[in-house]
A protein has these predicted regions:
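Rhodanese-like catalytic fold shared by cysteine-dependent sulfurtransferases
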Residues: 1-33, 40-85, 91-125
């Protein structure tokens, strides 16, 4: 029997067209915005996203407010519903939930990176 969180994760991922780490460079080249939602302590212990992959750091607890183009707390990149948000966490679990939340806001191109930061760092290694 699957746990409740596994069921929620499955539902979240059903909303997404998840991005393999190897496809991140192409996504960035077409204008996608990579968002690292890992907490500061996790970024410090695991490492920052390589400079080859410019990423905005937006911690999970404020993600929706920063990416919602109708929010007073939005970031400059939140120009509309057509932005391709690519959410990155450590291993690709929290990012799936976060990207699904962005989809729920109407940001229909939101997705996440399969395998998270651990997969992405292998692309540049």
């Amino acid at each position: 029997v699957a746990s409740r969180i596994d069921e929620i994760l499955e539902q979240a991922r059903a909303k997404l067209t998840r991005l393999p780490a190897a496809d991140v460079p192409a996504a960035l080249a077409r204008g996608a915005v990579l968002v690292d939602i890992r907490p500061a302590a996790q970024r410090a212990s695991e490492g920052e996203v390589p400079a080859d992959f410019p990423a905005l750091v937006i911690e999970r607890n404020v993600l929706e407010w920063r990416c919602d183009p109708t929010s007073a707390a939005r970031i400059p990149q939140a120009v509309g519903d057509d932005v391709e948000w690519v959410v990155l966490c450590s291993e690709g679990y929290t990012s799936s939930l976060a990207a699904a939340a962005l989809k729920d806001l109407g940001l229909h191109r939101a997705t996440d990176v399969i395998g998270g930061y651990h997969a992405l760092k292998k692309v540049v290694a």
